[in-house]
């Protein structure tokens, strides 16, 4: 299949090939043509049209048979893609079987064709996204377990706080992925529904056969028949867009963390290296986080597109002017961006390059200050909370002012040495002994992932 796109320079970077195929022009046409073929089979099943008309119609429902450029030019006059496509479909069928042509598109309207065609595309997109989320979850689970006990500086407000583990940080990314999978599972039955209402949503053109045809069509396309047509009730699509927005944001968080850890001043975690990857056109030494950039870019762009979907919700009466049209490129673009971000997230996470020694060095950049809380907690049990906190605060200030390690300052402080032995101080100022429940959080996140996958 030849993909038609105006963004060939960027698509390989921002979009997964598999998703680009779903939403290329041929993919859109095939979704609509699948609706028309399914409609013919459904109407023949209930006896509304002759069975002999089905084969000629179905045989003409192949996207490769149509001139996309000609259809695109016609849309500017027709106002939607279904009108010129149905005309071209009828013309092609008539050239082979004039009798069958009269049964094309019977009882349907343009929006039925386009919305159901879109849902069929979204079904394919949903499978791709779910598959990538599972794969990403598997990778993150493995990495979280691998680095479950690897200490690093926790950072709050972009400053060193207390020690955490790299595994705990990765487990946080994993938890967001797991929740996104759960949301997609929950919305799937609401999203994958038939659109079939005819001109104004009543299916009046089909008379008493309307509901039997709708039921048969839903069965043909393996979609759910909703309680009624949803021409101007767009919450299903907006819900899907919203969940994709959450996925994009979660991936952006992952990308932001990795990019910050790749900074020269941190240099703790890196994207996988490859020839020509992350270089500069002028600076030979550069190793840029090009994968993380895609995640952050998607997290920046997708919310605006989701906002467009929300803005398009108050559609007029039974069929909308302009608001429906605003969805056409928006939702596919959201899918494309999320797919590209997921693809990059998997590649980056699989090949993470970690420098535990650098993490250890960075933990000691503040010369023990990141463990001040650990000492304060123990002293509070012996001196009282306020006294201990004030004492540690003064010791920390002295350590900074004098350029000394907190361990040395504390050892010189009579109130501290009276309560804590040298051995106790050494243990309290060892990051490996102040990781709290970090390992537990890793175990819980990994367990949750695999329970959702089973």
Regions found by a protein language model. Give the residues of each.
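A helix-coil-helix interface module used to build multimeric assemblies
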Residues: 2-204, 209-214, 277-280, 290-294, ...
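Short beta-alpha connecting loops at secondary-structure transitions
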Residues: 20-24, 70-72, 277-294, 316-333, ...
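Amphipathic alpha-helices that form helix-helix packing interfaces
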Residues: 39-42, 64, 129, 133-136, ...
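A glycine-biased, small/acidic residue-tolerant capping/turn segment at secondary-structure junctions
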Residues: 51-54, 266-273, 343-362, 389, ...
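Glycine-rich cofactor-pocket loops
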Residues: 145-167, 269-279, 285-286, 317-326, ...
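A short, charged helix-loop
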Residues: 212-231
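A conserved active-site cap/scaffold subdomain adjacent to cofactor or substrate pockets
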Residues: 233-268, 276-335
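Long, amphipathic alpha-helical stalk/connector segments used for oligomerization, subunit docking
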Residues: 301-385, 391
């Amino acid at each position: 299949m030849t993909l038609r796109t105006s963004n060939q320079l960027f698509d390989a970077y921002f979009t997964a090939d598999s998703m680009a195929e779903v939403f290329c022009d041929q993919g859109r046409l095939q979704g609509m043509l699948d609706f028309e073929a399914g409609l013919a089979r459904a109407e023949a099943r209930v006896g509304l049209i002759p069975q002999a008309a089905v084969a000629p119609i179905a045989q003409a429902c192949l996207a490769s048979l149509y001139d996309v450029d000609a259809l695109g030019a016609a849309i500017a006059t027709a106002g939607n893609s279904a009108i010129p496509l149905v005309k071209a479909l009828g013309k092609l069928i008539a050239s082979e079987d004039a009798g069958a042509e009269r049964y094309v598109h019977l009882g349907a309207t343009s929006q039925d064709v386009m919305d159901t065609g879109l849902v069929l595309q979204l079904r394919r997109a949903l499978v791709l996204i779910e598959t990538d989320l599972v794969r990403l979850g598997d990778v993150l689970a493995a990495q979280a377990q691998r680095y479950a006990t690897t200490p690093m500086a926790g950072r709050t407000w972009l400053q060193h706080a207390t020690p955490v583990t790299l595994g705990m940080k990765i487990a946080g990314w994993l938890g967001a992925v797991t929740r996104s999978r759960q949301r997609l599972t929950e919305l799937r039955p609401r999203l994958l529904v038939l659109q079939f209402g005819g001109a104004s949503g009543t299916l009046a053109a089909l008379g008493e056969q309307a509901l039997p045809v709708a039921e048969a069509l839903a069965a043909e396309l393996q979609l759910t028949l909703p309680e009624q047509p949803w021409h101007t009730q767009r919450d299903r699509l907006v819900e899907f867009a919203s969940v994709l927005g959450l996925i994009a944001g979660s991936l952006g968080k992952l990308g932001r963390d990795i990019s910050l850890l790749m900074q020269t001043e941190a240099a703790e975690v890196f994207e996988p290296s490859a020839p020509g990857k992350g270089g500069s056109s002028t600076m030979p030494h550069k190793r840029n986080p090009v994968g993380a950039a895609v995640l952050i870019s998607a997290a920046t762009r997708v919310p605006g597109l989701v906002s467009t979907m929300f803005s398009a919700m108050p559609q007029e009466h039974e069929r909308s002017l302009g608001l429906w049209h605003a969805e056409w490129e928006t939702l596919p673009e959201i899918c494309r961006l999320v797919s590209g971000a997921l693809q990059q997230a998997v590649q980056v996470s699989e090949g993470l390059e970690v420098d535990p020694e650098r993490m250890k060095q960075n933990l000691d950049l503040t010369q023990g200050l990141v463990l001040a809380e650990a000492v304060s907690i123990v002293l509070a049990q012996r001196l009282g909370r306020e006294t201990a906190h004030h004492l540690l605060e003064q010791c920390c200030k002295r350590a900074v002012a004098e350029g000394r390690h907190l361990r040395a300052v504390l050892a010189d402080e009579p109130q501290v040495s009276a309560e804590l032995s040298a051995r106790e101080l050494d243990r309290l100022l060892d990051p490996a002994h102040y990781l709290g429940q970090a390992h537990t959080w890793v175990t819980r996140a990994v367990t949750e992932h695999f329970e959702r996958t089973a």
